[in-house]
Every structure is written in C-alpha cells, then in structure tokens.
C-alpha cells in the first residue's frame, strides 16, 4: 500500500522482516519531485551471510518438495500478483518514475515470467533412451543446484526479479535477492506477496544494499549461481568475480540498440515505433532504440515526421496520464545525460529536438525531455556509449548493407530492429546482424518469457540467458544415468 510517510526499508531473512545490522542508509527520492519517500539500508556482509544461511537451511527441505507441489505454490503467488496489479504499478511509478502506463506494462511482463515458472513440471522433464545397449537404459535427470542469488537493476524493479527467483525456486533452489537500492519498495511488496502465498521461510531472502552486498554474494562459497542485469562494466565485473569464485554466472549488460529504416517501410507506423522504443520508460531500458540508421532515400521525410511527432510528447510526473516521458532515476543520472547531449552538440551533431529546456514546464524532478540528434557518426560518444535516456541519434546510410555494417560496429549487441515491407531485406538483416534479439517491424524485440533473453558481445557475459529453457538449464544440474538390471 502506498502512503505519504517516509518508510525505513528492512531486509527479509528467514521469513522475517529484520533491520540491517549495519548503520549506513541511503535516501530514496521520488524522481518526479525529488522528495524523499524512503531510506534503504546499505547492508553489510553479515546480513548476506545470514540470508545465505537461511536459504541453505531451507534448501534441505524445499529441494525435496515434489515439482508439481512447487508449481501449485507458485500459482498462488501468481494469483496474488494478478490481484495486486494496480498497486504494484503505482509503486513502480512512485520510486522509478516511469509513467503508470509503462509501469502497468511492466507488471504484466513480470506476471508472464511467473506463468513460465509455474510450468516447472514440463520444464524440468529429463530425457530417456531405452536399450542403448543390450539390457541397458540411458536417461538424463534434472536437479536443483542449491542456493542461488539475483542482482537486479532499478529500471525494471518488478519484471527482472520475476525473471529470476520464481523460476529458480520452481526448479527447487532457494534464493537470495539483492535489488537496486534505488527502487527498494517494489522488492518489499514482491516478497510480502510471496510469503502470503504460503512459501516456507528461507526460500526467498531479500538483502537491500549496494556494492558490499554484491561483493558478498559473489564471494560467498555457499551461493552456487548468480543472475545479474545491469550496466556493462558492472556485468563484466560480476561475471569475472563470480566465475573466479566457482559460480555459474549469467550477466546481462548494456546496449546500444540500432533500428534500420528502409525506404519501403510503413512510415507512420515506423515513426510511432521508434518513438515508443526510444522515449517510453524515459529510455531507461536495455532494449530501447538509441540509434536509427535511416536510408538516404527516405531520410528527410522520416526525420521531418519523427521530429514533428516527438515534439508533441509531454514530459512530467508519471502519475499524470497525459505524460509520455517521466523523470530519470536520479539527479546524478540527469547531469550525466545532459553531459552527453552537450558532447553531441560539441562534436558537431545537429540537435533537432532539445530535451534540456523543459524545467519551466515540469518544475522539480529529474527530467530530460525527448532528444533527437541528426548527423551522428561513429566517432561521437553519443553513438558509442549507452546513455540510458530519451536520447536518439540518427545516422544516414546509403543502403541496408551500410546500415548492417554500422550496427555491427557497436561493441554492444543486445537488440536490433529493421522496418521494412520487403521479406528479402528482413531475411538479409536477420542473417547478418549481430544481436541477440532481433525485431522485424517490432519496436522492442524483447521476447516473451518462454524464449531466452540475452544479447551478444559486450551485452552479455555467460553461456545461458534468462527465461525459457536457458533459465531452466541455468538453475539446474544434470545427472546422466546408465543402468542395467540383472
């Protein structure tokens, strides 16, 4: 339930809400107003150790619960999430800033991830081949791996945690969750509803905090696997540190997603698609379109319509239904984004829509409006770096081949999109683009939960992505059994 009082956030360990043993706290502001809504503890190593001990103890019994029973328990959780959709969306808007429309969409995507986890009896089925030799049968069995952990970012405080702990727990593991200290309130509510669904204590533990919690998770010998979503430098660190300590790690990292706009595209739908991908959720998502490679033949017409439509977007508090672009997560991030816009201007890009000049309209809060640059090239930082904001760069290319070459020159390879009505163009794009997730006339090619989610190159560190069969493989270990009876 959302209240106006300033909340002091707690950890949840072994089925109970407990104060952190540390003394450091961090203020949590509403990004739309700058007003403090909570204080979150920056928990020390000792809190992580307690959470791991609780999860380790719970694993002894939870791992032996029949898979259909685990699935039924998750159905109860799923029902509670569905019953509380409106409240969950409001919490997201309050602490993250994204519009209520975007938050509602996130809630639904999170629920879909739990729906996947409820199908654990099917997902965990092994394989068998009788009579592999005279009187000998062979089979593969799947088992949980133990205590696992998830480290999640601020930009999807519901969806990304729900990619992780429901599926891991459905597979028989127990879980330690560390969500972003910037969005702790939604994590609290997810855990509350989890235990309302009747799960045994210690199956899910929540430790709030910052880098000390991350390091403690990566170094703890009893944690078998770590799932991470965040920026490229931190993802690289998590992967290298976690694997050095003998853990399985999946680390989903940064992005610089390109969209190629062909002359044969549906212009109206393409413009609206690019706007939605680039500027919804204030551009704070790893699947946002941040570069458009538009073919010269249609470039002027496309840009004219794009700029005109973008200038209609309203910026402001996400609770106001007319607003399309909400605030950025923190003042420090806003200043970073303004620095990138200034660098684009200094490097010679043409600023077609300037999102810096909106303070008079929106007042306090960490707002940057939709921003569009033309004349961008690969030497500019606004093309190279993940800005994580409503900032769109346009690069003009002569044809599809040049657009693909441009896209593949990025160090990131998370998602990529083509807008075209030509099947051959789409096929060429699909076969030659280097990205983990590809869209053809699909604005944000983030797959449904029953498919794996992962990029390539500097967008992903690991072997198995989240969700789908990749997720099941990540959270389980195999035993190959060869048997003969006399």
From Swiss-Prot:
* InterPro entries attached to this UniProt entry: Ald_DH/histidinol_DH, Ald_DH_C, Ald_DH_CS_CYS, Ald_DH_N, Aldehyde_DH_dom, MeMal-semiAld_DH, MSDH_GmP_bac
Q: Which Pfam families match?
A: Aldedh (PF00171)
> According to its UniProt record, which reaction does this protein catalyse?
3-oxopropanoate + NAD(+) + CoA + H2O = hydrogencarbonate + acetyl-CoA + NADH + H(+); 2-methyl-3-oxopropanoate + NAD(+) + CoA + H2O = propanoyl-CoA + hydrogencarbonate + NADH + H(+)
Q: Name the GO terms of the biological process aspect.
A: inositol catabolic process; thymine catabolic process; valine catabolic process
Q: What is its EC number?
A: 1.2.1.27
Asked if the record carries the keyword NAD, the reply is yes
Q: Where is the active site?
A: 286
Q: Which UniProt keywords apply?
A: NAD, Oxidoreductase
Q: Give the matching PROSITE patterns.
A: ALDEHYDE_DEHYDR_CYS
**Residues noted as binding NAD(+) in the record, renumbered to the chain:** 154, 178, 181-182, 231, 386
Q: Does the keyword NAD apply?
A: yes
The pathway this protein participates in, as annotated, is: Polyol metabolism; myo-inositol degradation into acetyl-CoA; acetyl-CoA from myo-inositol: step 7/7
Could you tell me one molecular function GO term of this UniProt entry? methylmalonate-semialdehyde dehydrogenase (acylating, NAD) activity
Q: Family, per the entry? A: Belongs to the aldehyde dehydrogenase family. IolA subfamily.
- Matching NCBIfam families, A to Z? MMSDH
Quaternary structure annotation from Swiss-Prot or TrEMBL: Homotetramer.
This chain's function reads:
Catalyzes the oxidation of malonate semialdehyde (MSA) and methylmalonate semialdehyde (MMSA) into acetyl-CoA and propanoyl-CoA, respectively. Is involved in a myo-inositol catabolic pathway. Bicarbonate, and not CO2, is the end-product of the enzymatic reaction.
The name this protein carries in UniProt is: Malonate-semialdehyde dehydrogenase 1
